[in-house]
Amino acid sequence: MAKKMKLSEITNMFAGMNVEALEGVTIEGDIEIDLGGLGGFDPMLAAALGQESAVLAQHFARIAGMFGYPVSVGAPAAAPAAVSPALAAPKLKDLIPAKFEFSNIEEWTTQVEEVPIGNTSADGGSRGKRILLGGEKALPFFPDAPMPNRNQVTIDVFDMRLGLAKAVKENYDDVMDNPGEWAKKNVEKFNADMITIHLISTDPLIKDTSPKDAAKTVEEVLQAVDVPIAIGGSGNPQKDPLVLAKAAEVAEGERCLLASASLNLDYAAIAEAALKYDHDVLSWTQLDMNAQKELNRKLMKQCNVPRDRIIMDPTTAALGYGLDYAYTNMERIRLAALMGDDELTFPMSSGTTNAWGARESWMVSSPLKEDSDWGPREYRGPIWEIITGLSLAIAGNDLFMMMHPTSVAVLKHMTQTLFGSIEAEPVDIANWIGAEV
């Protein structure tokens, strides 16, 4: 049996002999590492320890060489023999033929209600066109169930001059004192599908404009444009029902969208005006699906509003200010509707203009000195509104209330391309490095 020696014993053997180096001497043997006390361990650990042991062997060989005692280590294993070309797998000339089919989602059993806005002369009104919202049988842009009606954009108009972001104001500064001209510019120059007239001057804390005078502004807008319109109040829960009722009266037969009925005001009065004067109702809640169900149920059961006259606004939180909540809420509402919740099977509207409430959309730069450059707000603001709108379009939103003309144009182009009414131009992706965006 071969004698076992420790590396330290080899060193001690030559101690005191004044040997500087050995020539022509070869030390042969195996290196053993004592792992006693570890107990059993799995094969993976054994393999790992084997690899580490090989590394240690290399280190021991170098240490021995430093003392003048060369130690040979095992030669590396020979490379595996090359596979004969004759035995190699043949290359495929063609991929295996396969057909991709969209699966039918059995849970989606219910169609979203289709709601018209605007009455033409054939319907007893004076609008030049009627738009349809809703009617979906699946999530938006789903190839297996194409959307019957495209997304629509309504551009905001206000009944008084107010402070707006510079990027927005420069487009409307010449018409902000004339709601009729403002509406006309939105339609003729900025291609608005609808107009939303916000009667903010009726707020008791602003101008406290009377419902009668506010109704005259609605008449002015109706005469200036022939697209469908939405009529909004000031947000004052005491004044809005009175203002919207009077506005509904002067717009009788035009099938406007009254914005809005909510749980914190007299929704019954707004619903009554809608039924009496032939209008639709915007059912507005604040990021709460259960509250949305409750309000819709009350409009239908207590106020007898027909299903084809209800549009929901679950509230839009802008990019950076809760967009994920708004998106999730809308998506949950739409999925619940498709799966049969008849209290939620209505088209949805988004106050996409809320994007301009985010300071990042309109401020010149960050208030923090150490922050990075935000870029020009002339581009940043519209992009903020576009991203907010597009995100909610994917979640299932149908109608977008917007402000900036560029945002409107881009969002309409993107959603109509996804809808299929605009053919996208081919892009040479091979030249992606030098491509212009």
From Swiss-Prot:
Name by which UniProt lists this protein: Acetyl-CoA decarbonylase/synthase complex subunit delta 2
Keyword Mitochondrion among UniProt keywords: no
Gene3D superfamilies the record matches: Dihydropteroate synthase-like (3.20.20.20)
SUPFAM superfamilies according to UniProt: Dihydropteroate synthetase-like (SSF51717)
Matching NCBIfam families: cdhD (TIGR00381), PRK04452.1-1 (NF003375), PRK04452.1-2 (NF003376)
Family the UniProt entry places it in: Belongs to the CdhD family.
The keyword Zinc-finger belongs to this UniProt entry's keyword annotation: no
Pfam families in alphabetical order: CdhD
Record note on quaternary structure: Heterodimer of delta and gamma chains. The ACDS complex is made up of alpha, epsilon, beta, gamma and delta chains with a probable stoichiometry of (alpha(2)epsilon(2))(4)-beta(8)-(gamma(1)delta(1))(8) (Potential).
Top-level taxon of the source organism: Archaea
Biological pathway: One-carbon metabolism; methanogenesis from acetate
Keyword annotations of the record: Methanogenesis
Protein role: Part of a complex that catalyzes the reversible cleavage of acetyl-CoA, allowing growth on acetate as sole source of carbon and energy. Probably maintains the overall quaternary structure of the ACDS complex.
